[in-house]
Regions:
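N-terminal cationic and glycine-rich segments that engage phosphates or anionic surfaces
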Residues: 1-143, 185, 242
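Positively charged, low-complexity, intrinsically disordered RNA-binding extensions
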Residues: 143-254
């Protein structure tokens, strides 16, 4: 879940492997456990759980797997508590990086995060050092063609999204429509669009960069791609957000 929508080329390709799918399921399983601990196992009475379930469905996790994970999380020993932390820092050439973690061992995770920054030409910063470069908002992505290859009508979708409470409707990407919401409104907008028959490929809270930085030299491209890969391979890391403009240029280098 690195970067932001159209800048996530590397991640999207990596997630097609079975190993990456297993990683995604492990990470979402932790989010389910936290949501259930905080609000119980009924999604109708637990908006956070409902959001995580929607995220799991968008990641193509089968309903049976989601239900089993919920039952497992509801019956788990509550002594195993996951702690949410957000780390901020810089990648090569000043790329802004935000790392969201969910861990049962804060010291282990902090050490890993610092190591990845240091190893690949970046540095871990103080809280707030880069977050001002991002807007935290709800993001819903809907494919321009549905599962039956029918073209989704732009005007109809835009009207439905704005009526549901969306703040912005973006059409720059050739493959998806991007709908942005205020953080508290994500669930309501998503549910309204789902009720209208739309299927989404992403529906989550994201850090959206206000500006992007382009890398040009091969070493920086390699280091930035490898840094993101290491973060995403760590089970404690839930999301990595950055303002790297051209991750696709590193595809053939790693």
């Amino acid at each position: 879940m690195s970067g932001h929508s159209k800048w996530s080329t590397i991640k999207c390709k990596k997630e097609k492997t079975d190993n990456a799918r297993a990683k995604v399921f492990t990470k979402i399983g932790r989010e389910l456990a936290v949501a259930i601990r905080e609000g119980g196992p009924d999604p109708d009475n637990n908006s956070k759980l409902k959001d995580v379930i929607a995220k799991a469905k968008a990641a193509n996790i089968p309903n049976d797997n989601i239900e089993r994970a919920i039952k497992k999380a509801a019956g788990e020993d509550s002594s195993k508590e996951y702690i949410e932390n957000v780390y901020e820092g810089y990648g090569p050439n000043g790329i802004a990086v935000i790392v969201e973690t969910l861990t049962d061992n804060k010291n282990r995770t902090a050490g890993d995060v610092r190591h990845y920054f240091d190893k690949y030409g970046g540095n871990l910063g103080q809280s707030g050092c880069v977050s001002f470069m991002f807007e935290r908002c709800g993001v819903i992505l809907i494919d321009r063609e549905d599962e039956d290859e029918n073209v989704v009508d732009e005007d109809t979708l835009m009207e439905a999204a704005l009526e549901a409470g969306a703040e912005d409707f973006l059409t720059e990407d050739d493959t998806v429509f991007e709908i942005r919401t205020a953080v508290p409104d994500l669930g309501a907008v998503r549910d309204s669009l789902e009720a209208a028959g739309y299927k989404f490929s992403t529906a989550e809270i994201q850090y959206v960069p206000s500006t992007y930085v382009k890398l040009t030299d091969e070493e920086s491209l390699k280091n930035m791609a490898k840094m993101i890969e290491m973060f995403e391979d760590n089970d404690d890391v839930q999301n990595v957000w950055h303002n790297w403009e051209n991750p696709e240029d590193a595809e053939d280098l790693i």
